[in-house]
A protein has these predicted regions:
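Membrane-interfacial, low-structure loops and terminal tails that flank and connect transmembrane helices
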Residues: 1-9, 334-347, 658-663, 788-805, ...
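Hydrophobic alpha-helical segments
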Residues: 1-49
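Membrane-interface segments at loop-to-transmembrane junctions
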Residues: 11-12, 45-49, 77-85, 337-345, ...
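Hydrophobic cores of alpha-helical transmembrane segments in multi-pass integral membrane proteins
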Residues: 15-34, 52-67, 84-98, 285, ...
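Internal alpha-helical transmembrane segments
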Residues: 20, 49-125, 297-346, 358-361
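Soluble non-transmembrane domains of integral membrane proteins
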Residues: 107-304, 359-627
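Internal mixed beta-strand/loop scaffold within catalytic domains of large alpha/beta enzymes
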Residues: 133-136, 141-148, 155-169, 186-188, ...
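Bacterial N-terminal signal peptides
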Residues: 347-355
Length: 936
């Protein structure tokens, strides 16, 4: 009996079981992401996520979590903070289970002026209809991945046995993430057998097939089942807004009515992104639309697990804060240990604010070039273009633009423009934003961004033929018909006699869900955006420089000229004539007085009519200062060099058993502090300039990670921590400026305009800074382990200090990563009705949480070499973060999409990135024997 009790205690309440379970869970999730990448979402769900064994794994983890707390007598030891924090995980798992087993989700397709009282399920069913009346839906676990293990299904229909024997299931094509499949099965009913070939489309729609079984007609389909609602949704009107001068969607919305089944009106409602219809427990989200723009596709969700899940999220965040402040908690014990090691105490101060994020408005397409061009539709731009100037004349204008305008750009740079978001900004900012997006760099053939913008705007016919638009995809260049080895295309290259070459392709890509888009799809959208921007410059529709007395919206040249207000029309005509003629003359004679005076007069006019919208010159100059100072790129090398120098100084003193030179260390400390202050100033200015928090895209998140890293070094008050954090900040800024991240400020897509998203991204990216610091501290510890000798006793003290700093940084990083990930679930649930969808990005974030939770709990296994274990695992564990941040995008999200079964290309440098840390771990393991003293 005693042995049975011991066995149960081991299996249900032991860290020796809990930690391997966490590792197994993380491994299963990782494998599932690669299954999804190769075989589609349905395969990953059928093989991992929706399987009984995966459900059992969740339940087992839940039981072991509870059992471990009971066995460790946490309540008796007054570990209230730890109990509260881990209880939140229990509540989250229970909420997820309620959602998993009792929730419903799917899609509803509604055409204008029609109503629907049912929706298509997200899960796949065998739908059976007998004689067009009796219906039966059987949930199926079939996937092509394990087609050789298909089992017959036995059912009863109209009191007669029905046997469905699956023979084979296979994909219709080899494209990844395409779930279209064909199920071949034999149906036996009424003593008659027939073979069916059932087609399931990529949207999970089943195509029905029918056969006669004596006197009974049996119809089968393989796909979504129709779930009936106790009410109807009627689509009154679908609205699609497009970007100015473009066929590309900007936003879309559905004007609907909620009706009773007898068509009685309950209420009208407008559904759009982040604006959800809630009714009788069901939530309706804007998902997609029909190509003819006469129908909408709504995602439908009914989630009884939402309340316990949200409560669990709240408890988790409060519990994490409690653990950090608990005087008997691990975090403050480590802090006290550092004090005993003559290290400073730790202070965490992180302010997270979510600012205003404006929307992007639509604008009427125009074309403006003095009086020489007329308003045109973009698809017909080639047909109405003026006769080509000779190549020599174009080169002459480019030469004069390069040489003459260089010292006369200030008046243009300071000219205030209202962008499509409604924000007033200097033309200098517009030029940098647009030109970098188009060219993927800030200069072109000796011209800076402002010169390029002026050239495109004043001489559009010249620039239609210049190959300047960047594209990274050879397949797209092949479709356009340009040389494959030339990364740049001209505006005229994307048009032919039939119009815009990418029009149909753009429409097709927009119909796909984001996670189903491959490399070509994403590049199509990027190039389409660049084409839109070039057209916007050609037409001068971006040049909203004329304030309106009646509204806060400023007018573009054509809007002002065509304004019913005769005064505005007259003033605009005169200003434009003087600006265009003055610029043209200036390029010929190098005399700029006329155009500069006109721009000054225009600024005075703006100030008089825009009133409080007009920016003070100090604010305009601050924005221009930010544009040209280029804080972040210039900080890269100083961060790296200063971090390396400080590291060399500290390590050399440790090896020699001497005190580091005070003046050298202070100088390096002050230099890094100045870099951090400049970095902070740059972030504040970028926040001020952009109008939203500086972590809204990949580039800004890298800036924020770099900032969080160097701040972590300062608050930890350790020279080694500061050297590591400075080096890490430099590496993060280096990665941000490699060229594949867009540094310019752009409008946010509708789904990103969320308060919850700002919090989610800021917290989760800051966690990467702390976990990145753990990686560097782990490397330092391993190097010091390798350097250990009997006569270098001071190295042991340093290793213990680094180990304490490392663990504190990891605790902070894990808490922030966990809170940030689950806050992302709140954002997703409020945006499209699902707080967890096993998307590869969120799944790998969960894997990273599991990895670091496992690392921090390894000490409960009783190892005597905790500093070595922590150092090794903090280095190796960081690969999960790298996979989350970079690997998912490269291998799992379609940036490089390959046919199923194709090998994934692995860059050569990646082998070294993995081999070197492993080599350090192996070398350090020979001198691993070092224990952390008992903490009090």
């Amino acid at each position: 009996m005693k042995s049975l009790k011991s066995l149960l205690s081991f299996l249900l309440a032991s860290f020796w079981v809990a930690i391997p379970l966490i590792a197994l869970y993380a491994l299963a999730c990782a494998i599932a992401t690669f299954i999804e990448n190769d075989y589609g979402t349905s395969a990953s769900k059928a093989i991992v996520y929706n399987t009984p064994w995966f459900n059992f794994l969740h339940a087992y983890l839940l039981v072991v979590l509870i059992g471990t707390f009971i066995n460790s007598k946490a309540l008796e030891r007054k570990r209230y903070a730890s109990l509260f924090f881990h209880s939140s995980l229990i509540l989250i798992i229970l909420g997820a289970a309620i959602t998993r087993f009792f929730g419903t989700e799917g899609l509803m397709h509604v055409r204008e002026n029609s109503a629907q009282s049912s929706f298509e399920s997200a899960d796949t069913y065998l739908n059976i209809t007998l004689n067009d009346t009796t219906k039966l839906s059987l949930k199926t676990p079939f996937t092509f991945y394990h087609s050789k293990r298909l089992k017959p299904i036995h059912a009863t229909l109209d009191h007669k046995p029905l046997i469905l024997e699956p023979l084979e299931i296979y994909k219709q094509n080899a494209i990844k993430k395409d779930d279209a499949a064909i199920l071949v099965l034999k149906a036996t009913y009424n003593g008659v057998s027939h073979k069916f070939n059932l087609i399931k489309t990529n949207r999970n729609e089943g195509i029905e097939e029918s056969e006669m079984f004596k006197d009974d007609k049996l119809s089968l389909s393989f796909g979504s089942a129709y779930i009936e609602l106790p009410f109807q949704i009627k689509l009154k009107r679908f609205e699609l807004e497009r970007y100015a001068g473009s066929m590309s969607p900007s936003s879309y919305a559905s004007e609907v009515e909620v009706l009773k089944l007898d068509n009685t009106l309950i209420k009208p409602y407008r559904i759009f992104m982040n604006h959800v219809l809630d009714y009788e427990g069901y939530r309706f989200f804007q998902s997609s639309y029909d190509t003819d723009e006469k129908g909408t596709i709504l995602s439908v969700n009914k989630d009884p697990g939402k309340i316990p899940t949200y409560l669990g999220y709240a408890m988790l965040i409060l519990g994490a804060l409690w653990l950090l402040l608990d005087k008997n908690g691990r975090f403050l014990k480590l802090s006290r240990f550092l004090k005993s090691q003559q290290a400073a105490s730790f202070l965490l101060a992180l302010i997270l604010i979510s600012p205003f994020t404006p929307s992007f408005a639509s604008e009427t397409p125009i074309d403006m070039h003095g009086g020489k061009s007329a308003s045109i539709e973009r698809q017909n731009v080639e047909n109405s273009a003026n006769k080509e100037d000779s190549k020599s004349a174009i080169l002459e204008r480019l030469k004069h633009l390069r040489e003459y305008s260089k010292d006369h750009l200030k008046a243009f740079q300071r000219l205030q423009v209202q962008d499509f978001d409604g924000r007033i900004k200097p033309l200098d900012t517009i030029s940098i934003e647009y030109i970098h997006k188009i060219l993927k760099k800030d200069d072109f053939q000796g011209l800076n961004a402002m010169q390029v913008l002026l050239g495109i705007m004043f001489f559009p016919n010249d620039w239609r033929s210049i190959k300047m638009i960047y594209t990274s995809n050879k397949a797209l260049r092949k479709l356009i018909g340009t040389p494959l080895d030339e990364s740049r295309i001209a505006f005229r290259d994307v048009f032919d006699s039939r119009g815009y070459k990418l029009k149909n392709l753009v429409e097709e890509v927009n119909q796909k869900s984001p996670n189903a888009r491959n490399e070509l799809d994403k590049d199509v959208l990027k190039v389409d955006e660049r084409i839109n921007l070039v057209y916007t410059l050609f037409s001068a529709q971006f040049l909203r420089i004329f304030p309106s007395d009646k509204t806060t919206a400023w007018l573009s040249p054509v809007e002002a000229i065509n304004s019913p207000n005769k005064e505005i029309s007259s003033v605009a005509t005169e200003f434009l004539k003087n600006i265009f003629n003055g610029f043209d003359d200036a390029l010929k004679t190098n005399q700029w007085d006329k155009v500069e005076k006109t721009l000054k007069d225009l600024s005075i006019y703006q100030q008089e009519h825009a009133k409080n919208l007009y920016l003070p010159y100090s604010k305009v100059d601050s924005e221009i200062f930010l544009n040209h100072t280029n804080f972040f790129n210039r900080l890269t090398l100083p961060y790296i060099l200063l971090g390396l120098l400080l590291f060399i100084v500290v390590i050399s003193s440790l090896v020699k058993n001497t005190i580091p030179n005070v003046w050298i260390t202070k100088t390096l400390y002050v230099a890094i502090l100045l870099c951090a202050l400049a970095h902070s100033m740059g972030l504040v200015l970028r926040w001020y300039v952009s109008g939203h928090s500086p972590w809204s895209n990949a580039y800004e998140s890298m800036l924020y990670i770099a900032w969080a890293s160097v701040i972590a070094g300062f608050v930890l008050r350790s020279k080694l921590a500061l050297s590591a954090s400075s080096f890490l900040a430099g590496i993060a800024l280096f990665v941000a400026h490699l060229g594949f991240m867009d540094p310019q400020i752009g409008h946010l897509v509708p789904v990103l305009k969320s308060y919850w998203l700002n919090i989610h991204v800021s917290v989760i990216t800051a966690s990467y800074g702390f976990l990145g610091l753990c990686f560097v501290l782990g490397i330092l510890s391993l190097v010091l382990f390798i350097l250990r000798k009997e006569d270098r006793f001071n190295l042991d003290k340093t290793i213990l200090s680094i180990s304490a700093i490392n663990e504190m940084s990891m605790i902070l990083g894990l808490f922030m990563l966990t809170a940030g990930n689950f806050l992302g679930g709140v954002w997703a649930n409020e945006s499209w009705g699902r707080y967890w969808g096993w998307d590869p990005k969120e799944t790998w974030a969960l894997i990273s949480i599991c990895v670091y939770a496992l690392i921090l709990h390894l000490r409960f296994l009783g190892s005597q070499n905790w500093p070595f274990i922590l150092a090794s695992s903090s280095v190796l564990g960081f690969y999960s973060v790298l996979m989350t941040y970079f690997g998912v995008n490269y291998y799992l999200s379609g940036l490089h999409s390959y046919a199923a079964g194709d090998p994934l290309p692995i860059p050569t440098f990646l082998y070294f990135l993995v081999a070197i840390p492993f080599a350090l771990v192996i070398l350090a393991s020979f001198k691993r024997h070092l224990s952390l003293p008992k903490l009090v």
